[in-house]
């Protein structure tokens, strides 16, 4: 029966549905109506150490996070010029933390309004240094606001944050970047990384290298717009160097796959995880190779494609599961996550898979709408095979009530707007 379904599912996905743009408009309308009630939960007024209004995932999470805030703020900026201020303020709140902490550019990836972070590693998280999204957020906000000058007072903060990452997460031998732990990556238990305290800083990571490449390009853009020509050239050269190193060391042509690589041996970590596909949002591969990677793995039910979105780990992997968990790790070993599905959506669009991108937007739209109708909010991840919301649950919450989740799930609206309105111009910033 499984084989029969897999064959049917593959054939169905091979043919884009007719009148996709027209058919997604009612779904967009319903999702937009539901999100109008949930979106305000992600915005908190300035307080404590935060000089500006700040962004939170809402529900289970009350803190300001790095990539959560980036995705939420990007969504808000996509919706209107007025709301781009929240992405701007997210950047400035993190930049302000760099000044307040005063630790040579170190800023953690999560901040609290009422408690200054202690500059020392934790047993589980390690140093948990902020991910490379701040400059990208600054560019998206600046483009939407039509104003780059607000970045000038925070420019040196951004420079120090980038320099800290170069000192602590860059391997000059390989000319590539590594995560300290899987937790730092945001994909808490990603099997292509490790949380072993005896094996920290061990794995050169394709997703981090891609994010850092884009961060370099964003820094170059900011420098150019601020009239800093020498610094603009510096960051563009670093981006070009990093791209070349990724192709040399992380791309395995015989497998048509990017793999993480161990720093000590140079051996690939041959696990097909969702993070392997992040480079497809950038022009790193020749187009033909990128399309091969998508056809063979990303849009293939035997690997990444599931009935309810794109999995976080290949179905063929021995660790594949859809267990509901949130503490100490959320589950990135199978469930569907909206933020990474948004990246896959961008990759599909970039590589010319228009019908597949529209189908993915529709699948995710129906997924979150069903969740909202049942629970009044959403979950942070979903069972890839059944569409069931996984975490957080009432049992995982301190007060034993369903807390919900909003956060980056708002990006479903952006994907549907791109398809239903045939306007994707704001989903990526100018390179």
Model-derived regions: residue spans:
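Catalytic cores of carbohydrate-active enzymes
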Residues: 20-31, 41-47, 166-178, 213-289, ...
